[in-house]
A protein has these predicted regions:
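Flexible hinge/capping segments at coil-to-helix
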Residues: 22-23, 92-133
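Short beta-strand->loop
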Residues: 93-104, 187-201
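Short amphipathic alpha-helical coupling segments at ligand-binding clamshell hinges
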Residues: 1-3, 41, 45, 140-141, ...
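Short, well-ordered beta-strand segments
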Residues: 28-32, 79, 129, 175, ...
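A late-sequence structural motif
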Residues: 113-114, 192-224
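Hydrophobic hinge/microswitch elements
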Residues: 63-67, 72-75, 82, 136-192
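Alpha-helical "hinge/linker" immediately C-terminal to small N-terminal DNA-binding modules
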Residues: 1-26
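Central regulatory/effector-binding core of bacterial HTH transcription factors
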Residues: 26-87, 158
Length: 224
């Protein structure tokens, strides 16, 4: 009798569960975000898809190579990264350039007060926080230091751009960020702009498992 009552209760609950599932259905977009990609950049790149009614956005962050493997296995709809996918005949993925953004340098007010030199010479007079060497932009930053004859003191290197900005806000060092992060850094975090570096830009890519993308939200991200 107890089992019969449980079956009856389940039968009553089933229509409600079906209705709830139906109401929660939406347009799903599963995105892999390379761990070298700054969070404000990821938000900016996904913005064209976020006005979709019923959007169900799934974002996962991970190592670039791991995300490409998941993409090839169709566990992800798209990967956002700061570099194109490497040429590999065994990996059927396709890179789409989304744009680029110049780097800008920031520091806490207290740190900025330590130097009255103009940008970029002021970078030689304060500790710096940099993206790790896993980030595609790091080599371009190092080359720029050489061209400008800068010999800065590196106080920290970070995989996570959000963590880098947090330590920068605390005054540990000056740091670079894309121009798309400017409002957040100067407004919410109260950092000061040291200067703009148009000679170093970050490039951004969407990587898909299809040459001709069929997913409507990935098409929006690509501007199609």
């Amino acid at each position: 009798l107890r089992y019969a009552e449980q079956i009856f209760q389940l039968g009553e609950q089933l229509p409600l569960a079906v209705r709830e599932a139906a109401s929660s259905q939406g347009v799903r977009l599963s995105v892999g975000i390379s761990d070298g990609l700054p969070k404000p950049v990821a938000r900016h790149l996904l913005l064209p898809a976020t006005d979709t009614e019923g959007l169900h956005l799934l974002c996962s962050e991970g190592e670039f190579d791991d995300l490409l493997a998941d993409l090839a296995l169709h566990r992800l709809d798209v990967v956002l990264a700061d570099r194109p996918a490497p040429v590999n005949p065994n990996l059927k993925v396709y890179s789409h350039a989304l744009g680029e953004a110049a780097l800008m340098w920031y520091a806490s007010p207290a740190l900025r007060a330590l130097s009255d030199a103009a940008f970029p010479a002021c970078l030689d007079q304060m500790p710096l926080l940099l993206p790790s060497r896993h980030a595609a932009v790091r080599a371009r930053i190092d080359d720029w230091f050489d061209r400008k004859s800068l010999r800065p003191r590196v106080a920290g290197e970070f995989e996570d751009s959000a963590l880098l900005a947090t330590f920068g806000e605390s005054g540990l060092g000056a740091f670079p960020a894309t121009e798309w992060s400017h409002d957040e850094l100067t407004g919410q975090r109260g950092l000061q702009l040291l200067g703009r570096c148009d000679e170093v830009v970050e490039h951004f890519y969407a990587i898909s498992a299809e040459r001709r993308v069929q997913h409507p939200l990935v098409q929006k991200v690509l501007g199609q």
